Amino acid sequence: MAKNVRIFHCSPEAVFDVLRDGWLYPTWVVGASRMRGADPGWPAVGTRIHHSFGVWPFVINDTTTVLERDEPRRLVIQARGWPVGEARVEVEVEPHPRGCRVTLRENPVEGPGSLVPGFIAQPGIWFRNRESIRRLSWVAAGRAANA
């Protein structure tokens, strides 16, 4: 499972302010290119956001579903990206003297992507999520500073 950790200069609540707004998903998730909709009540367990991934005009429409939510500490989602497959993504947020410590874990769980050996897949996932967690930190801290 690819794991990325970063110290954010904002509160755990500020991180969840971003996670609660499904429309912000493409601003911080590398590869997500646009939002098409969010279920009422997002991010309640079982709700979905409807997004696309890829580079226009080569985009694929799919969804991400909330599996677990323990705000402001933890959000677990299942991101679909067929034909590549699906991944379980965990976002854990802990208080830290400088704001909060965010851990992002991702593991392919369904489809062809889950058949790729970890030692091949995980470095690429880690590299992509390094940028995703960086973007999430900027969005959360920026929104908190302007609140």
Sequence positions of predicted segments:
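Alpha-helix N-cap/helix-start motif
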Residues: 18, 28, 59-60, 86, ...
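Residue-level detector of beta-strand structural context in well-folded domains
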Residues: 4-6, 64-65, 91
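Beta-strand/loop substructures that line and gate deep hydrophobic ligand-binding cavities in soluble
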Residues: 79-131, 147
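Glycine-rich portal/gate segments that line the openings of hydrophobic small-molecule binding cavities
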Residues: 36-82, 88, 96, 101, ...
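Amphipathic alpha-helical segments that line or abut small-molecule/effector binding pockets
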Residues: 13-16, 130, 134
